[in-house]
Amino acid sequence: MSIENLKNALPEYAKDLKLNLGSLANEDVLNQQQKAGTFIASALASRSNLVTSAILAEFGPQLSAEALAAAKAAAAIMGMNNVYYRFVHLVGGDYANLPARLRMNVMAKPGVDKVDFELWSLAVSAINGCGMCMESHEKIVRQNGLTQEQVQAAIRIAATVHAVAATLDGEAALS
């Protein structure tokens, strides 16, 4: 399966998603590794077998083995961190002063350019709705030279991939 197959699988009422998916696959404000990794990390965060398979088939070959592992790691570690830090942020109190005591070594040595890993972490954090994580990752990527347009492109990819996954999974449940 490919991006084209995903587009063709979308129902007529999701035509905007189809158009967005096509234009984002050709987005040129991000470099190839940034774009491919954002698509893959977002697909994994969206938890759809169909979407993840199609996006991995389309974008996996564009990444080195190390970059592919890092995109997967961004989705995995943010799956944990987004829950933990969203709790800390929303509940408040003294939780922020306690050590997390969760291993996060991959964040220090992701195996790719740190800014790319942070961008993928930002996209996943947007999908998972962790404000504290989004603020932190956005600050890091901006301090390391990414533009607002590049950040926005990654979030547009995350939003569209997530919506495609929800739509296709919903349609599958209805059939």
Curated annotation (Swiss-Prot):
Species assigned in the record: Granulibacter bethesdensis (strain ATCC BAA-1260 / CGDNIH1)
Cystine connections: C130-C133
Keywords: Antioxidant, Disulfide bond, Oxidoreductase, Peroxidase, Redox-active center
Physiological role: Antioxidant protein with alkyl hydroperoxidase activity. Required for the reduction of the AhpC active site cysteine residues and for the regeneration of the AhpC enzyme activity.
One GO BP annotation of this record: cell redox homeostasis
Transit peptide listed as a keyword: no
The name this protein goes by in its record: Alkyl hydroperoxide reductase AhpD
Family label: Belongs to the AhpD family.
Catalytic residues (UniProt): C130 (proton donor), C133 (cysteine sulfenic acid (-soh) intermediate)
NCBIfam families: ahpD, ahpD_dom
Catalyzed reaction equations: N(6)-[(R)-dihydrolipoyl]-L-lysyl-[lipoyl-carrier protein] + a hydroperoxide = N(6)-[(R)-lipoyl]-L-lysyl-[lipoyl-carrier protein] + an alcohol + H2O
Pfam family for this entry, one: CMD
